Amino acid sequence: MDVSFQATLPKGYALEENSLFGIYATCTRAEKVNTNMAENSGIAKYSFTEEAIPYLYKSAEGEAVVGKKGDHNYKFYAFYPYDASVTDLSAIPVNIPATIDWKADDTPDLTMLLAAQATVTSIIAPVPMTFEAVAQCRLTIRIPNTTVPVIKSLKVAPVKESVFKGQLAWSGTYDIFEGKATSNESSGSKSITVNFGSGYTLPEGYTEISFVMGEFKYPSGGLQLQITKGDGTTITKKMFEASEVFAAGSSKVYTLS
């Protein structure tokens, strides 16, 4: 029997049809524990659909997770986005860049690593999987062209970086079995900068600049936005209230006034 999955995504997180997930599945089979259930004997590649319910199904022949009579003690681990180079689920790469080069014609990469696991005694398809974002959140900054006709850069950072113990940007790994993210010691940054080259002329109305950040607690002294305009002058604004929580999977919007 090919195993399918019902995918519950984080609130507000949308995916395109046929987005790819990785599924690692084991069971006890013929008294052998932790037997890999994938047809490819590795990590199965599953497709996402939302035709009726959010649902994961095998993406191609040979990519299914297969259950057999007598199997038991099932363990399922799933992650998004699928990456063929990921073979060790105790070290899934995570990368949140500290510097972003923004291009008006490109769709910003707002992908957050999603992960889920489930342990069941029997299979009643589809197997429910509840996904959570891994140590990442999204921030959207809305900028009016009446305030900033041309933008060269924007920077988000704590007002008092010296007392901020978190990291807005970092690279590292995520262990899906332990549910733990680990950053590389030298990779952390307390700020994120978006560059617009020699300057980008904002169209009429509001322009939304969105990017991914690491989850963090609101820093002592606050969080600030610094925008450098085309003429070299800067605007600095304090963002959000001290009670704001930037939890994994959350999306925040700040509108420059």
Per-range role (PLM):
Residues 1-150, 196-209, 229, 239, ...:
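Short, low-hydrophobicity acidic/polar segments
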Residues 153-218, 222-246:
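Contiguous ligand/interfacial binding patches
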